[in-house]
Amino acid sequence: MNPASFRDCKAWQADGLSLSTTSNEACKLFDATLSQYATWRNDESLGGIEGCISAMQKADPNFVMGHAIAAGLELVGTGSSLRLNERLAGDVARLVEMAAGQSLTPRERLHVSGVEHFAKGRHSEACEAWEEILLDHPRDMLAIKLAHDGYFYLGQQTPMRDSLARVLHHWTPQIPLYSYLKSMYSFGLEETRCYDEAEKVAKEGLEMNPQDGWAAHTVAHVHEMRAEMDKGLQFMASTEKGWEVCDMIASHNYWHWSLYFIEKGQYEEALTIFDNHVMRLCKASGSMLDMVDACSMLYRLEMEGVNVKDRYRELLQQTKPHTEDHVLLFNDLHFLMTALGAKEEATSRRLVETLQELAEAPGENLQHQLARGLGVPMCQAMVAYDQGDFGKAVELLRPLRYRFTGIGGSDAQRDVFQQLLVHSALKSDKKQHQKFARCLLVERDAARPNSLLTNRLIQRANALHI
């Protein structure tokens, strides 16, 4: 990134996105922070996102949007719980108080409102605030990106796609970060199963910028959902040099790479990626995305019969401190995978019990509201599966199978729970569950023809003589 290209006060105003500060340095550092967020990359030459935020707040300690982006990025990282992190709770409270005492533009006030909503677990209201900004300011990349992430956490695939469709025509290829706008739109297309168009738009973005890790990520999803394993392997290998520099998405792209190997039954190759990339990057970053990917990968391998207990124990050191965060159900479910895999009964029990407590008095937090009817029974199903009570796991998961989107994430990420339901049904001693497993596999084969993983499971079902 070229620091000379970052916008000062006048440049932001010229773009119709005025910032309430007189500090040109603060404006440029805000732009640098936003650019790194949009590109999934901490640029060491700029000091990374944390360095830019620190310098920005020193340049103008009263810059409301500087504090808004700082709190917003920490919150969407989902690694800090407002209930447990007094410093973060204080930052959000000070942001709201600071905004109330200053003369801000309506756009800036909506940004503060969005951050406050998100902080309190009102994710839908947060997205509404960012969408309100985009009605008048369709080139506000911060609002675009925060809404995109918000919809992702909500599992709202169509709004995630349409949010980008509404603003894309206001941009041109000459505007900085345009390729990343295309890549976000391509991901929305992929998640709404428009695979041909998703691949086309993503590759247009990659042609403009081979280092667009999010565009590469969309193509990886397309190959996964089509069960095009060899094409996926070839694509990831041919584009690795571009996206491996995107430190905030690189581990996730390696995770996608590993899924192709798991699908093909090439477990040693998958474990090599886990050891050399996924786990290494997870330990280095402490990022929730990297963490949940590592959890999911081991859980999938274990369901395939691979012994990964030692790796679970190593990963537990990363996930255990977040046992009681309960920021996202998606995170909780993945942390439980590792606690169960590492045979840490106390940690597993504490995670489920504290989630149950929040579900009983959720307040306005959407994740806690969803916990009672979705998150907690999914956790209980995983515990039942771990204890060998496969019939109970089926009975808990079966009524929820069309509601899994509510935990957020992508189709590819949530597929681990569909696999769990199939494995539970196959292992249940009840014939009706085994017949249900066969039906699930017929569905799976129709949705993703030529899946080697599905074929292996069908062979297992056939061996039961259902």
Please provide the spans of the model-predicted regions.
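Structural motif corresponding to the intra-repeat A-B loop/turn of tetratricopeptide repeats
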Residues: 39-40, 77, 120-121, 154, ...
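C-terminal non-catalytic interaction modules
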Residues: 377, 385-466
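A conserved active-site cap/scaffold subdomain adjacent to cofactor or substrate pockets
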Residues: 249, 254-320, 332-335, 340-341
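TPR alpha-solenoid repeat register
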Residues: 66, 109, 142-143, 177, ...
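"A position-specific structural signal for the A-helix of alpha-solenoid helical repeats
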Residues: 24, 31, 35, 69, ...
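Solenoid-like repeat scaffolds
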Residues: 54-60, 96-102, 131-138, 166-175, ...
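Single-residue signature of alpha-solenoid repeat helices
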Residues: 45-49, 88, 126, 160, ...
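Inter-helical turn/loop elements of alpha-helical hairpins
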Residues: 22, 27, 35-54, 58-105, ...
